[in-house]
C-alpha cells in the first residue's frame, strides 16, 4: 500500500477492499508458498535438464509461476470479500471498484496467460459473484474522512 494507490482510489470502500486483498496475501502466506514452489520447480528442472540448461530452467520456472500467482490473486480477492462481509460496514465488493477503474483505463493489455494477475474483467466478475453469494454488495460507507486523507497525501 502506498500513497499513489490511495490517491487512485475513489472511496473508502475501495480502500477497504484493497487492504483486505493485501491482508489475505499475508494471511494465506502467498509469498512463502510462492517461494517454496519457485525453488522447487527450479531444482526439479535443473535435475531433469542438467546443470548447463540455466536459461531454459529460468524461463520454464517463470512461466510455471504465472499460474500460481494468478491463483493467489484470485484467492486474495475472494478473501477480501469475506473479510469485508464480516465488518457489516463496507460493501464487500470494494476491491471490484479498483478493477473497474483499471479496466476502463485499459490496464489489462497483457494476455492473462502471460500475466502474474488475472485480467480485471475476470476479477470484477469473481468478486461481484462472491459478494452476491454472501449478500453484501449494497452497503454504503461514504465518508468525508477519505477525501481528507487523500488530500493530505
Give the positions of each predicted feature.
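A Zn2+-metalloprotease active-site environment signal
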Residues: 1-153
Amino acid at each position: 500500500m502506498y500513497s499513489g494507490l490511495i490517491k487512485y482510489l475513489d472511496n473508502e470502500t475501495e480502500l477497504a477492499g484493497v487492504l483486505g486483498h493485501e491482508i489475505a496475501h499475508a494471511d494465506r502466506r502467498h509469498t512463502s508458498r510462492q517461494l517454496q514452489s519457485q525453488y522447487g520447480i527450479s531444482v526439479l528442472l535443473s535435475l531433469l535438464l542438467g546443470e548447463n540448461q540455466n536459461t531454459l530452467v529460468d524461463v520454464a520456472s517463470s512461466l510455471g509461476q504465472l499460474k500460481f500467482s494468478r491463483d493467489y490473486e484470485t484467492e486474495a480477492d475472494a478473501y477480501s470479500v469475506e473479510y469485508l462481509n464480516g465488518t457489516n460496514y463496507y460493501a464487500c465488493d470494494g476491491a471490484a471498484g479498483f478493477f473497474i477503474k483499471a479496466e476502463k483505463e485499459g490496464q489489462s493489455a497483457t494476455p492473462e496467460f502471460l500475466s502474474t494477475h488475472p485480467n480485471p474483467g475476470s476479477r470484477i466478475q469473481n468478486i461481484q459473484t462472491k459478494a452476491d453469494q454472501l449478500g453484501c454488495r449494497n452497503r454504503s460507507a461514504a465518508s468525508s474522512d477519505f477525501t481528507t486523507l487523500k488530500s493530505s497525501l
